[in-house]
């Protein structure tokens, strides 16, 4: 086997694995989109189709009759059932109603329906009216944007310090900072909640916002990795031109860190948009401050039997993060690769 043939086989295998992996990750989203366009009955049916569709009907004597595929004399015909019976049923040929009624012996429940594509776009309109989306979107955007600003501001300064300055115990401090990534949040949950409770912050936005203005280890790591790739000669040139540390950060470092900053910002924005536990813990009893994650949970509990509406409002909630990712995808991928996440 030649080297070229081996490489071709490897590429084919890689392509197949990639397609399978992408399909695996997209499957829940595709199911959600499909379910949001179905009726309640279609979702609860054991024989539901992957796509939204409903049985075809034919109007006969002012009544809508379902179409079935009926075997007659060894030939399958599409007929409309006008009278259902236990052992025999009466059908009519929709292409030739004047030919009269057709009596078919057998159990009609064993027959297959004739289906047609029938998406229920009204689910989105009904779901939108059933929940205060504008309030939920406003609260979620406020929470996501202000915490994204806070984490970018603090993480940038900390990463700049670790990547550009030498100080005592620098390595040990960085190791301690990174070690907090593996620290389970449950370990600090009770002490942190107690502190916020005694400060009188429970029931306000402060416990959700203030901590993000004190850096994040994961974001610091990503930004530091990116900054380490910027030549130090540029810092020296800026210093010769009279720039201090802050001016160097603003004029030299930040313009070159745009991809990494966008990546970190998107990571945090998506996390804040989907954050459920923290708002549930600190905003309990204040529905006017609920973000969309809590709103969807409450909606799901209220409309637990209306699965199609739950999936419709869930798809609506995904629109904003999806659009943001599409717009910033180029910078996001560049920042992820250069900062070392890909590796």
Located regions from the model:
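A structural signal for multi-pass alpha-helical bundles of membrane permease subunits
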Residues: 2-343
């Amino acid at each position: 086997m030649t080297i070229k043939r081996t490489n071709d086989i490897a590429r084919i295998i890689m392509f197949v694995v990639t397609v399978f992996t992408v399909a695996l990750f997209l499957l829940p989203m595709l199911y959600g989109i499909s379910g949001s366009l179905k009726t309640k009955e279609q979702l609860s049916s054991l024989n539901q189709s992957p796509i939204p569709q409903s049985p075809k009907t034919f109007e006969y004597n002012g009544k809508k009759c379902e179409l079935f595929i009926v075997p007659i004399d060894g030939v399958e015909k599409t007929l409309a059932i006008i009278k259902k019976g236990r052992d025999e049923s009466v059908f009519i040929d929709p292409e030739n109603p004047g030919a009269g009624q057709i009596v078919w012996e057998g159990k009609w429940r064993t027959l297959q329906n004739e289906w047609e594509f029938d998406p229920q776009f009204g689910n989105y309109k009904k779901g939108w009216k059933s929940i205060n989306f504008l309030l939920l979107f406003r609260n979620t955007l406020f929470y996501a944007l202000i915490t994204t600003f806070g984490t970018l501001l603090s993480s940038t300064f900390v990463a700049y310090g670790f990547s550009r300055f030498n100080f005592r115990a620098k390595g040990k401090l960085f190791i301690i900072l990174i070690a907090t990534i593996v620290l389970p949040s449950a370990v600090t949950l009770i002490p942190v909640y107690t502190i916020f409770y005694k400060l009188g912050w429970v029931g306000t936005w402060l416990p959700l916002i203030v901590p993000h203005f004190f850096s994040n280890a994961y974001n610091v790591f990503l930004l530091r990795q990116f900054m380490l790739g910027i030549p130090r000669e540029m810092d020296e040139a800026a210093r010769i031109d009279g720039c201090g540390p802050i001016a160097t950060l603003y004029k030299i470092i930040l313009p070159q860190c745009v991809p990494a900053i966008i990546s970190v910002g998107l990571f945090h924005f998506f996390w804040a948009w989907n954050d459920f536990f923290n708002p549930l813990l600190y905003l309990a009893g204040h529905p006017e401050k609920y973000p969309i994650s809590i709103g969807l949970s409450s909606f799901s509990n209220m409309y637990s039997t209306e699965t199609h509406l739950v999936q419709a409002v869930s798809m609506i909630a995904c629109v904003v993060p999806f659009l943001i990712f599409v717009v910033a995808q180029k910078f996001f991928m560049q920042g992820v690769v250069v900062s070392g996440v890909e590796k």
